[in-house]
A protein has these predicted regions:
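Bacterial N-terminal signal peptides that target proteins for export
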Residues: 1-10
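Sterically constrained small-residue positions within well-ordered secondary structures
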Residues: 5, 15, 78, 224, ...
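Bacterial N-terminal signal peptides
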Residues: 9-19
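Signal peptide processing junction and immediate N-terminal pro/mature segment
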Residues: 20-24
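Solvent-exposed N-terminal domain segments of exported/luminal and surface proteins
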Residues: 27, 31-258, 265
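Gly/Pro-enriched, hydrophobic low-complexity segments
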Residues: 27-57, 100, 232-302, 337-443
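Extended beta-strand-rich segments in extracellular/periplasmic secretory proteins, especially
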Residues: 175, 189-239, 295-372, 382
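Long, C-terminal catalytic modules of enzymes
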Residues: 433-461
Length: 461
């Protein structure tokens, strides 16, 4: 099995050594030959399932279904489309150059349960004009500061990756970490760890996120005060944990100032600072299937790995997954045995940056190597391959993005984490059985709202 993993990795590596783009672009190309965030505006000139269309502005409220009112569940703007292709274990060999290593292993491991329905591609990414303007400015001012990013606020810092392969990889990773996901969003969502026999239990939370980095009132890094975002979550289920709460102060430069986290215990009615919520710390609600830095495909300081850019490639990845959050689909139908139900999943051909991190000598992490596939338009990591200490592929992570046109922003509607060795998986971001999805319509609170004192008040409600 290890030899198969290494062989597949070698084949993918060889296929990616020739990037599909030149790196001679500059900031003046943003909004011209490049999209406002740095993707190639042109399509690939191919047809059928291989076609990548030109970017023409994305999916905004003006083009969205007219019957939508935020924060309702989004109707699928592509509901009338049918798959152009189905990739499964029997035919995957002829499409392997378009598949991530992890997806290939999922197909091999679950030949009766997993397949990809490949639809026409739509480049739906749209962002507010101010984010586009800030990104153009950041293209000339942002720079790496060791493992950190400096010189940018309110935009994508490195829309045109440049420099060495290591520099480009770190810049792409920072684009993912700082990508636009609104300013203040709230939602009620569930997560579940699905066991080998298909059983699961839901953990449900009320969540609030304030992306201070994108607050239009914050104009300078000094005003930002090294805060990327605040995250507050109050547990609703299961009953034994109800009333507990978590607050995270996510810093931009975590080597200079590590993230801070606090937990409120409803039974003890006490707020305590968490000693460690980073790197490979296991997440309790994930039943050991997700580390702290697995969340959002990757988060936190990138300093435990040596990063390199492998290249840019056209690949079949999850995209425009409106069906996965449809209220017509119940959790019991979505959370199927072995893998997340593939029927409502939508896969499309898109260009992705492929970067790889190898654990640095003397550093500790349960993953010896990580490979990320980053959407060129949104800078969202859409797939991740995680390797164990022996060098064998261990876990496969998939993000299922869609455009939230009312903001507008692109974010994953849910994330799934598959353990190929334990034959279990974890899903977070479930909203199908909730009355609403993300609500980005509420006024933005200030820093004082996200304090340990406020955490206790939220937890006891």
């Amino acid at each position: 099995m290890r030899l198969k993993h290494f062989a597949a990795s070698a084949l993918l590596l060889s296929a990616l050594t020739s990037p599909l783009v030149a790196y001679a672009a500059d900031a003046s190309d943003l909004g011209q030959s490049l999209t406002p965030l740095g993707g190639e505006k042109a399509g690939n000139g191919k047809s059928g399932w291989q076609a990548i269309p030109a970017w023409t502005g994305g999916l905004t409220a003006a083009q969205a279904p007219r019957n939508y009112r935020p924060p309702q569940h989004h109707p699928d703007p592509f509901a009338s489309e049918r798959p152009l292709l189905q990739v499964n274990a029997a035919n995957m060999a002829q499409y392997s150059s378009y598949l991530t290593t992890g997806v290939q292993d999922l197909l091999k491991t679950y030949p009766q349960s997993f397949y990809l329905n490949v639809y026409p591609a739509h480049r739906t990414l749209a962002v507010p004009e101010r984010v586009a303007e800030n990104t153009k400015r950041c293209a000339s001012t942002a720079h790496l500061k060791g493992w950190a990013m400096d010189g940018c606020v309110g935009g994508t810092p490195f829309p045109i990756p440049h420099g060495s392969a290591k520099d480009k990889a770190l810049q792409i990773l920072w684009n993912h970490i700082t990508r636009f996901r609104g300013v203040y969003v709230i939602r009620r969502a569930s997560e579940a760890a699905v066991q080998r026999n298909g059983s699961y239990s839901l953990a449900t939370n009320d969540q609030e996120i304030y992306f201070k980095y994108y607050d239009p009132k914050v104009k300078t890094l000094a005003e930002l005060n090294n805060v990327l975002f605040y995250f507050m979550s109050v547990q609703l289920a299961p009953p034994r944990l109800a009333g507990g709460a978590v607050l995270v102060r996510e810093t931009l430069d975590q080597r200079a100032e590590p993230r801070e986290a606090w937990g409120y215990n409803a039974g003890q009615r006490r707020v305590r600072q968490a000693p460690n919520l980073s790197y490979d710390t296991p997440i309790a609600d994930a039943d050991g299937l997700r580390t702290a830095d697995d969340t959002d495909m990757f988060n936190g300081a990138p300093d435990r790995y040596d990063w390199t850019l492998i290249g840019k490639k056209e690949m079949i990845v999850p995209y425009n997954d409106y069906q996965l959050s449809s209220p017509a689909i119940k959790y019991r139908d979505l959370l199927t045995r072995d893998v997340l139900n593939p029927r409502p999943q939508r896969w499309e051909m898109h260009r992705v940056w492929v970067i790889e991190g190898t654990l640095r000598p003397g550093k500790r992490h349960i993953y010896s190597k990580r490979r990320f596939y980053v959407d060129e338009d949104s800078w969202q990591i859409v797939a991740a391959d995680q390797y164990d200490s022996r060098g064998a592929l261990w876990r496969v992570s998939l993000a299922f993005p869609k455009e939230y046109w009312e903001v507008p922003m692109m974010w994953s509607t849910l994330d799934a984490y598959f353990d190929l060795q334990a034959h279990r998986y974890h899903v977070m971001g479930l909203t199908n059985e909730e009355p609403t999805e993300f609500d980005a319509t509420k006024p933005t609170p200030g820093d004082e709202y996200f304090s340990p004192q406020a955490l206790r008040r939220r937890g006891i409600r």
